[in-house]
């Protein structure tokens, strides 16, 4: 019977972790470029691993999609924690909003499958990620509102819906990034303090 030393075990675990990260990176890129129907063999090949390695980490396509989606949410959350310390909360919010667009460029290729999973047995997973995303948006909005840069009647759910609306109508495969970012800037300008508030919200 072969005995694996502690150092060898650590090396194997580190190698497995690197493979997982690489698979997620390649899946993220290919989902954005081709959609969720992308061949899993192509993803494994791009990551430089065998298909068996992919299935060990992600037994089903749904598992891989969820992992990519979760990684994007975590990245947006982490970015909000970095940006919240900025001396310019308004510009920090704008930068986070632009990062949200990049996230949606990936998610758009997975929308149909994600919606199916949201309504099925994976719905609990999405409640957690939705809460994480809303907390990140609130984290970015609060200091900007407190600094008098952003209107006080803006709420995180509304911001997320506005950004989501932009992204769902801006397919990264056919819409120039500059056009999408221009729309994000228009939304940001509408959020700024001093912008007109509709009569229904006064």
Model regions and ranges:
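Amphipathic, non-transmembrane alpha-helical scaffold segments
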Residues: 16, 69, 73, 126-134
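Hydrophobic alpha-helical connector segments
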Residues: 67, 81-106
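Basic, helix-initiating cap at the start of DNA-binding domains
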Residues: 1-46, 63-66
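Short, hydrophobic secondary-structure boundary micro-motifs
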Residues: 39, 110-116, 149, 153-154, ...
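Amphipathic alpha-helical segments enriched in hydrophobic/aromatic and basic residues
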Residues: 31, 39-40, 51, 61, ...
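Short secondary-structure transition hinges
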Residues: 95, 101-136, 165-173
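Short hydrophobic/aromatic patch on the recognition helix
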Residues: 48-58
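C-terminal peripheral helix-coil segments that are non-catalytic and often amphipathic
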Residues: 1-7, 134-135, 139-150, 172-202
């Amino acid at each position: 019977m072969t005995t694996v030393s502690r150092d060898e075990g650590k090396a194997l675990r580190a190698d497995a972790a690197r493979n997982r990260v690489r698979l997620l990176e390649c899946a993220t890129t290919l989902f954005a470029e081709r959609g969720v129907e992308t061949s899993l063999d192509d993803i494994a090949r791009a990551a430089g691993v065998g298909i068996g390695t992919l299935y060990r980490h992600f037994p089903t396509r749904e598992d891989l999609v969820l992992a990519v989606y979760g990684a994007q949410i975590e990245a947006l959350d982490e970015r909000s924690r970095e940006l919240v310390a900025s001396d310019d909360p308004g510009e920090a919010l704008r930068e986070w909003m632009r990062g949200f667009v990049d996230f949606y460029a990936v998610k758009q290729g997975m929308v149909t499958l994600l919606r199916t999973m949201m309504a099925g047995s994976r719905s609990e997973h999405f409640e957690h990620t939705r809460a994480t995303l809303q907390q990140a948006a609130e984290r970015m909005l609060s200091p900007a509102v407190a600094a008098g840069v952003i209107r006080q009647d803006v709420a995180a759910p509304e911001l997320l819906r506005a950004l989501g609306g932009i992204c769902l109508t801006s397919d990264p495969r056919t819409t120039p990034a500059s056009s999408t970012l221009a729309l994000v800037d228009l939304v940001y300008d509408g959020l700024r303090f001093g912008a007109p508030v509709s009569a229904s919200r006064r």
